Amino acid sequence: MIPELGRRPMHRGNEDSSFGDDYEKEIGVLLGEQQRRQVEADELERELNLYRSGSAPPTVDGSVSAAGGLFSGGGGAPFLEFGGGNKGNGFGGDDEEFRKDPAYLSYYYANMKLNPRLPPPLMSREDLRVAQRLKGSSNVLGGVGDRRKVNDSQSLFSMPPGFDQRKQHEFEVEKTSASSSEWDANGLIGLPGLGIGGKQKSFADIFQADMGHGHPVTKQPSRPASRNTFDENVDSKNNLSPSASQGIGAPSPYSYAAVLGSSLSRNGTPDPQAIARVPSPCLTPIGSGRVSSNDKRNTSNQSPFNGGLNESSDLVNALSGMNLSGSGGLDERGQAEQDVEKVRNYMFGLQGGHNEVNQHGFPNKSDQAQKATGLLRNSQLRGAQGSTYNDGGGVATQYQHLDSPNYCLNNYGLNPAVASMMANQLGTNNYSPVYENASAASAMGFSGMDSRLHGGGYVSSGQNLSESRNLGRFSNRMMGGGTGLQSHMADPMYHQYADSLDLLNDPSMDVNFMGNSYMNMLELQRAYLGAQKSQYGVPYKSGSPNSHTDYGSPTFGSYPGSPLAHHLLPNSLVSPCSPMRRGEVNMRYPSATRNYAGGVMGSWHMDASLDEGFGSSMLEEFKSNKTRGFELAEIAGHVVEFSSDQYGSRFIQQKLETATSDEKNMVYEEIMPHALALMTDVFGNYVIQKFFEHGLPPQRRELADKLFDNVLPLSLQMYGCRVIQKAIEVVDLDQKIKMVKELDGHVMRCVRDQNGNHVVQKCIECVPEENIEFIISTFFGNVVTLSTHPYGCRVIQRVLEHCHDPDTQSKVMDEIMSTISMLAQDQYGNYVIQHVLEHGKPDERTVIIKELAGKIVQMSQQKFASNVVEKCLTFGGPEEREFLVNEMLGTTDENEPLQAMMKDQFANYVVQKVLETCDDQQRELILGRIKVHLNALKKYTYGKHIVARVEKLVAAGERRMALQSLTQPQMA
């Protein structure tokens, strides 16, 4: 073993040589010393065991090269450790164990010709090709790419994030005692499946076991926050020696690939859906969501903040080329600290598929601002390697919040200055009483703010004011981005899931963002919410399997937004970033998640309209509690909300009928400021109508005054026209006249409107005729036209009913009588003729019947005119009725007109009406004519109707005759 010797990273160039002569000499020395040491079987097994991560599954690339040496070139030199064993086959341990080793597979295929006695590996050649394919695009100069030292226990994965250097020895002992059974059956070291229940320890288990120990401050504290914790963090941070800042811009030789499944896929381009994970504050597989700067620029995302990879080829490149750049020149102590920092930043840093740019060690507090400013300037000059807003990453994230142990804008790369500016602008200094620590409260705002800047403001350290120019573009993307800035925890059902992980007081939540759309909960969340949604009365909604806009969108913070009513959005009862969709805004929430402003603990999606809010707790309680009897006084302060709700509106209408004066005054005071809005509301208009009916007289007058100057637009509105009609019915005459005059010049427009015609009809009914002369005079010369209009025909009928002025009547009737036949056959005009027959004067009926004489059979066979003929039979006098019957019977014994009418689909109803309305003598005459044709009528569909009616009449006549015969002898 070679303790404390770190390998210096080196980038591959375009030439064939992988490294220079100096490095070849150094590597030769290291390999020679390593070869001279004979490792016992148990030591070798321990060494191999250290190569696998105790915190997360290693990459396939790393597993292949881990046991074979860190500087392999594909030949037998990397596998000299296998050649120095104690057994005859050249192995120092059990054959079965080494045959499971993926490094042995490469060794076998490289040396099988030199040593035919080598036992075959347990991995097929096809699996090897897949592993080599995943490895081929890596720019690591051999090795796993995780900066582990050769045969050194100081490997990154031997000390997971959250462990300080005092815990390394204990962790090594635990790793040494681990049995070889941790090797998976698929031959990959520490590569469990994606399923639940792997044998390997998770980060959560390690954190829980290490709760009592201090942690060095990286950028993310890894255990629940307390004052002592931050004190320890600051002390630990101050104890760290400054390490050299690494260069910016050069591609990094360190890469990680995400574990895609329990076994190697035969396809080198794995399905990106396999990487989807729960967007909870949990640790994610190494490498998920990481894309190098060069690759990121060529990635086409669905939205500005969508971190998902759209192409499977991009995913392959990302898996093998996810970089963390760095430079050499680190001392041994700084190397160890940076190794730990690299993994910690990787595990807790950007998760959103944004570019991971060059990470830096912790500088001293005295020179933080100077270094950060220079490095930020450098990062702006190098747009290809640094994260910018154009790439979706924002300001270079490694320089954010250098003076803050907890911050919550890591996902989109905003520096503290921009964050605090947004906090000031959007009022994120309203914290929920649920979260008691400053860290949780700081993450409650939708923009996220430093926990030590509760009121917003600028952070001096690490600040570059030039980057605040990106705020406008960032705000535009927030307002218009399809994926939205959402928080999964804003969903109260998600609180149960989050609470089970004990996350509310964890400061690491501040920076644990799931920006990558493929890191969203596609399986676990839907399964969980599917079972939980029934508790809240709303089914789970989702789009396609790839849709991340419902409960799965990239989040903008781990904590929900401010629950208080937002001062920039006074009409919304919630804060600004809710993940709830438009169809779910009225879902019932637990009362514990509500606050005094009527909002819900959560945020409001920015693409929702301003009038889409969540109902108040009072309204929700009213709708959910069916047994309790509410009174009007109990909903004080919520009358407008109740009026806009279906059940709340009905409740107010019922209570207003028997309300006291005080209750009416309370309702009146609340609805008056919103009267016009309620008049056009689907449910609110009924409350206004009911108040016109049952309100106090002064209140009705004041409410009617609200209508002035708005009569025409309200008359043309679906719900407003109902309020206008009710007002015309109940308000005082002077107000009626004033309201009606607003329609002057717009009468014909209102008559032809589906809503306005009702207002005109109500004016004709309720306003004295002398006050609506301008309406009636508009109809002169247009009576026939209006009579054939679907809405105008109703207005003409109201005129015939309520206008009794002789001059008006004569003018209207003259136009109608001149076109009786045409109107009788019109689909709307026939109603006007029927109205005249029913309500007109006798001489007017006679004129109409005479006009139809000679055309009765023809009119009876017409769909609309047949109704007019029936009205003539119903309302005509005996002489007029006899005249019509004789025309139907005809002049011959065959009764041809009658036969034609009985077989017609419309005229047969006229014949039935004749049998109902004529006297007994005429009925007997008609029945005698019909009986002759009964057998023939049974063959026709409509003739059967006549047969059935005749049979009933005959049966009724026979019974009547029988009764008469029985009563006559008794009388005698």
Swiss-Prot record:
The modification Phosphoserine is found at S202. One of its GO terms (cellular component) is cytoplasm. Gene3D superfamilies: Leucine-rich Repeat Variant (1.25.10.10). Pumilio repeats lie at residues 634-669, 670-705, 706-741, 742-777, 778-814, 815-850, 851-886, 887-928. Residues 219-228, 236-246, 299-314 have a biased composition (Polar residues). The modification Phosphothreonine is found at T269. InterPro entries: ARM-like, ARM-type_fold, NABP, PUM-HD, Pumilio_RNA-bd, Pumilio_RNA-bd_rpt. This is Pumilio homolog 2. Its main location: cytoplasm. The pumilio repeats mediate the association with RNA by packing together to form a right-handed superhelix that approximates a half donut. The number as well as the specific sequence of the repeats determine the specificity for target mRNAs. GO terms for biological process: regulation of translation. It is found in: Cytoplasm. The keyword Repeat applies. The lineage of its organism: Eukaryota, Viridiplantae, Streptophyta, Embryophyta, Tracheophyta. One of its GO terms (molecular function) is mRNA 3'-UTR binding. It comes from the Eukaryota. Signal peptide: none annotated. Sequence-specific RNA-binding protein that regulates translation and mRNA stability by binding the 3'-UTR of target mRNAs. Binds the APUM-binding elements (APBEs) in the 3'-UTR mRNA sequence of CLV1, PNH, WUS and FAS2. The gene is APUM2. The keyword Kinase does not apply. Residues 1-25, 139-163, 211-249, 268-314 are annotated as: Disordered. Keywords: Cytoplasm, Phosphoprotein, Repeat, RNA-binding, Translation regulation. Residues 614-954 form the PUM-HD domain.
